[in-house]
Swiss-Prot record:
Biased segments, Low complexity type: 1-15
Disordered: region residues: 1-31
GO CC term (a single one): mitochondrial small ribosomal subunit
Gene: MRP51
Protein family (similarity comment): Belongs to the bacterial ribosomal protein bS1 family.
Species annotation: Eremothecium gossypii (strain ATCC 10895 / CBS 109.51 / FGSC 9923 / NRRL Y-1056)
Protein name: Small ribosomal subunit protein bS1m
Molecular-function GO terms, alphabetical: structural constituent of ribosome
Major localisation: mitochondrion
Keyword Mitochondrion appears in the UniProt entry: yes
Database matches in Pfam families: Mit_ribos_Mrp51 (PF11709)
Subcellular localization, as worded in the UniProt entry: Mitochondrion
Length: 360
């Protein structure tokens, strides 16, 4: 075997490959999940020139993290970019100690647009595909822009579930099978929705066992677990944040390494009028209420402004709890028309007719 053939075999082998990238190293597109191989550029690694690649990196590159898509090239110089990308988001979440919640059928924060977005390869599955507002539409991948071909595919899926639905009725509600002609159609369709919801929360494989859902490597903590600190048990996560924009009712807030837009109401209006543009120099406490991980990997956080009692009385806010929230997210939201209740009801009616029709 010649050296060229051996080199070709080695280059094409699994031990000499990195995951195939889904795009260029540097792209302005939104990145919610890792897209390239990432290495940590420590001081000791830079000194020894060891990164696991077959060529060295220029010494002037001092970035902490590097991404690349090849171990070696014909020019003996690997293309790389000094971008931390997803790594910095993971570090920020771990520093906060917040456990992200997955978007599931029981959560009300998942919209139809997020439910039908491309799934995150780190944790895709039926367990996070169901929307609480439009369960049938989101389960079968139907949106306001679905064409006739997608509808045909959804109808085939419903028809394929008919034998399983009949067996489920025999096990859980046998009276519906025995007295089918005397049952109310509304009750019958209600059981069909219950059946769809049950199978949507289970894995499509593994013999129907519950699917283990992770947090994409953002954290390994458990929700509800007590956190220890030098001052005792830590029950809430409070971080400092700044108000970046005060024009109009929309406020831009920077907190915990994330920047987002949200409604803060009129509680800070007097502070805005008094400080003007200098409000950016003031730091306000924000409590991290919830971190939510959507199906496409987008991270959405609920931050609540904390107002001291003396400050509230000083500005005439009263003793009521401030319930205003601002939504802190990784990147901009995608504007898409949501499915109305009438459209969802019409779609559910057609799909349930197919599922409950045992005669065909």
């Amino acid at each position: 075997m010649s050296s060229s053939n051996l080199s070709s075999i080695l280059r094409n082998s699994r031990i000499a490959q990195v995951p195939k990238p889904k795009g260029p190293l540097f792209s302005p597109d939104k990145k919610y999940v890792p897209t390239h191989q990432l290495i940590e550029n420590k001081a000791s690694t830079m000194h020894r020139q060891e990164w696991g690649m077959k060529s060295s990196i220029p010494s002037r590159s001092k970035s902490r993290y590097l991404i690349f898509d090849e171990l070696d090239t014909q020019q003996r110089l690997t293309s790389f970019e000094a971008i931390g990308q997803y790594q910095w988001n993971r570090i920020r979440i771990q520093e906060l100690g917040v456990v992200p919640e997955r978007a599931t059928a029981g959560n009300s924060f998942q919209t139809s647009a997020d439910a039908n977005a491309p799934s995150n390869p780190l944790f895709s599955g039926f367990s996070s595909r169901l929307s609480a507002r439009t369960p049938l539409s989101s389960f079968f991948g139907l949106t306001s822009k679905s064409d006739a071909k997608q509808w045909k595919a959804a109808e085939k899926k419903v028809a394929a579930l008919r034998p399983a639905f009949k067996k489920w009725l025999q096990d859980h509600h046998p009276h519906l099978i025995i007295h089918k002609d005397q049952m109310d159609p509304a009750d019958f369709r209600k059981r069909a929705v219950e059946f769809i919801t049950e199978i949507a929360t289970r894995s499509s494989g593994a013999g129907g066992s519950w699917k283990v859902v992770g947090n994409g490597g953002l954290t390994y903590g458990l929700k509800g677990r007590l956190q220890q600190s030098p001052l005792g048990i830590k029950q809430n996560t409070v971080v400092e944040g700044r108000i970046l924009q005060t024009n109009g009712m929309e406020k831009s807030v920077a907190a915990a390494g994330f920047v987002g837009n949200g409604m803060l109401g009129t509680n800070l209006r007097k502070v805005d009028y008094a400080m003007g543009d200098l409000v950016r120099t003031a730091r306000f406490p924000f409590e991290v209420k919830q971190a939510r991980l959507l199906e496409n990997g987008r991270l959405l956080m609920d931050m609540s402004l904390i107002e001291p009692k003396n400050t509230a009385r000083k500005y005439g806010y009263g003793a009521k709890e401030n319930k205003n929230r601002t939504y802190i997210f990784q990147r901009g939201a995608v504007n898409e028309r949501k499915i109305s209740s009438e459209e969802s009801a019409q779609q559910a009616e057609e799909l349930l007719n197919i599922l409950t029709n045992f005669e065909n």
